[in-house]
Amino acid sequence: MHEWFVNYAGSEKVVEEILKVFPQADLFALVDFLADDERGFLGGRRVRTSFIQRLPKARNAFRNYLPLMPLAVEQFDLSAYDLVISSNHAVAKGVITGPGQVHVSYVHTPIRYAWDLQHQYLRESGLEKGLKAWIARLSLHYLRLWDSRTAHGVDAFLANSEYVARRIRKTYGRDSKVVYPPVDVARFTMRTGKEDFYLAASRMVPYKRMPIIVEAFAAMPERQLVVIGDGPELERVKALARDASNVKILGYQSTEVLADYMARARAFVFAAEEDFGITPVEAQACGTPVIAYGAGGVLETVMSSADSKKRTGLFFRNQTADAVRNAIYEFEAAGEFQPEVCRANAERFSVKKFRQRLHQTVESALATPEGRRQ
């Protein structure tokens, strides 16, 4: 059970690998609007969808039906299955299962905009005042109540990082086992000879904080920055870089082009607070060190150390342009970062290790039903 299929991104890569571990699995989602050229990872499976799929304007505005999603996910009849795996960052774990079934929920994150990020979500959505704001607050209140209740229907929680495991404990009062997401490190080639530019790459959305990276480099004209990615904030990023000849905005690029820039970059700069964060791991797979905002999943995936034989990057403590700029100075003064160490660290998050860990944890839940609840 996955929430929605609208593009092939991080959570869909997890689903892809779950399907490889359990190739006989049937697939359910609230909506499925994947383009034909993005469906390959489903292996020809038909996705069974909810009534939201057929509602007006669902293709482009399915998120507007958030208040209906708890009802929709509860309508799936999964009673014929011994094992149910939900891929959850919103409502997927709310599927109804019986006492004779095992429900394992792989949690990318609890529904952040209903919990600790509610106020940020309302602010960035322009829903701080007025009738719509109060309707949104009421909807999120009831969503929290539902989200808490449905946690009781999960037999075993899997978290995509220690950071998310702490969120699960805080939100649901449940322990979880950490199974890091699969990163296709084999797709990336380690390069030892680096060029004299820095790379930032992500979707251009507010929480990624791409503007602060561009602002930082605009104030350092002697240092080169390449920016890859597309999204709602792209025009803002372009405007910030308009008078900075040292900042090159490439927009969307293919994975092959991104991998090439990652391998050649002096360092990868990352300013988001992510629950896991795949791109910093991909950069390390290229032998490229990471300069990251020190919060969230990067504290588990990037190794900061005074020992050059152990370190793969360093952190800055505030999401500001000044903090990024100071981190660049610190990085350049730190001395050598070894590509081999970066690559070895990235291997901890390989597809092979994900499959092994997932299989072990699910088999454990199936084998010991009387003690599987955590």
Regions found by a protein language model. Give the residues of each.
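Nucleotide-activated donor-binding/catalytic signature segment of Leloir-type glycosyltransferases, i.e.
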Residues: 235-260
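Active-site donor-binding segments of glycosyltransferases and PAPS-dependent sulfotransferases
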Residues: 21-93
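Conserved donor-binding/catalytic core segment of Leloir-type glycosyltransferases
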Residues: 189-226
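A charged, aromatic-enriched C-terminal amphipathic alpha-helix characteristic of glycosyltransferases
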Residues: 319, 333-363
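Donor nucleotide-sugar binding/catalytic pocket of nucleotide-sugar-dependent glycosyltransferases
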Residues: 112, 136-189
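Short hydrophobic beta-strand element within catalytic cores of glycosyltransferases
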Residues: 289-294, 299-302
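Acidic donor-binding loop of glycosyltransferase active sites
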Residues: 263-275, 288
